[in-house]
Amino acid sequence: TVDIPLVFPNRKPHHQLRIAWTKNLPVNHWGQRTDKISLSSSKIIKNFIQKLIEEKITVQEKKFAPEYIQKAWGVFNELLSMEYDFYFPVLFRIQAKLLGNPFTVVPYSYEKYQHILTERDQTISIMEKVFENYDALVLPVTLGSAYKHVEPKYENGMLLNFMEPVKIDGEIIENIAVDTFYTNLFNLMGNPVIVIPIGFTESGLPVGIQVVGRRWSDAKLLIVAKQLFEVAGDFRHPPGFMN
């Protein structure tokens, strides 16, 4: 075995930190509105950004092209089909395709898999350019604050109720879109992510924010995320839990 030491870089002074941020990812996925977070979360994130600016941290808004986000989601879902649907009977996949699932890959082939991986590399290259000029990217974790827990239901090892309705500012959205839209893309691309708590809604529900780093820069991201939390984070122990 090779012992690779973990070396943490030095902290940058606040005025040398450069943070990119985006308040939404501009695309609707599976017919779900995913391009606008809840008003309560938006206010808290706006306050978080303002605190960073007051501490002389450079914060610049980054807007992603809808075509890029849509393409990345297509790659994510096609990979999911190739690597996960493999365990389903072929008739199940054919049925999904006939019912209009645009991401179901039928039939499988090595060439298709390599093509999807190449497209993944292309999405990674575009995202990596963001980190040429910034220490981190911050964006929402979910479309809203925490909501009432949905008890999972399984059948034959499969989660059944991942499309339960969640109300965001009066609009009904499936919980899979609420929970995963802002996180799955970084699972696809392999970026390290840290979630820090930044505030609470008027009803006391917590809101967090993702701090995303460049690939293979986990140690640096830990330092940057800690700095951002020290400046603008907000954590409270839940009632009934010891400090």
Residue ranges of predicted features:
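A short, aliphatic-rich beta-strand micro-motif
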Residues: P192-I196
